[in-house]
């Protein structure tokens, strides 16, 4: 499962952060186990804007301003740990390769794929996976779950508590999407 947080809805928008979680549909994992398996990367915004002409959308900045302070700190506040975009792409690819390479990558719609692929090309890196490996969570949930509404559904798992999901934190968004695929009703 893959998720990015961005500063726009175009493929050339700044990528703030990304998370990826490997999962196997045969494994019966819980939400906390998914969080533990995640890779989270935060990217340097200034480098993306100044060196690669990535876009910052005013409306998206206004949207971020209305989000919870924790997720704003996680994704928006510059940190010494922010990665050069090329390093972030390499880390994501290394994570994927540690689980056997080109596997199916699930994401919530097409923006995640377009953004990370565009960024990889801009910084001269290989894309994290081939274009045909991407799958859409929303479509799967809408087709497979009787409680589906707008790409979300109820999750039936004894330890899962929806209120523990931190919306717009890419790791939590990934874990929720996996839970819906595995345990959606």
Regions found by a protein language model. Name each.
Residues 93-96, 111-132:
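Substrate-recognition/cap helix-loop segment adjacent to the acidic, metal-dependent catalytic center
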């Amino acid at each position: 499962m893959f998720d990015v947080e961005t500063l726009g809805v175009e493929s050339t928008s700044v990528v703030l952060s990304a998370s990826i979680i490997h999962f196997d549909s045969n494994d019966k994992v819980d939400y906390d186990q998914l969080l533990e398996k995640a890779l989270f990367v935060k990217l340097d915004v200034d480098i993306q804007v100044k060196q690669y002409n990535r876009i910052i959308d005013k409306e998206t900045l206004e949207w971020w301003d209305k989000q919870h302070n924790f997720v704003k700190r996680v994704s928006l506040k510059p940190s010494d740990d922010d990665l050069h975009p090329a390093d972030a792409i390499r880390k994501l690819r290394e994570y994927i390769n540690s689980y056997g390479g080109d596997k199916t990558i699930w994401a919530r719609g097409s923006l995640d794929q377009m953004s990370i692929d565009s960024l990889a090309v801009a910084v001269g890196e290989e894309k994290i996976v081939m274009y045909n490996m991407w799958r859409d969570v929303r479509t799967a949930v809408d087709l497979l779950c009787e409680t589906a509404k707008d790409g979300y559904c109820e999750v039936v798992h004894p330890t899962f508590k929806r209120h523990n999901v931190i919306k717009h934190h890419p790791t939590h968004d990934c874990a929720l999407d996996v839970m819906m695929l595995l345990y959606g009703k």
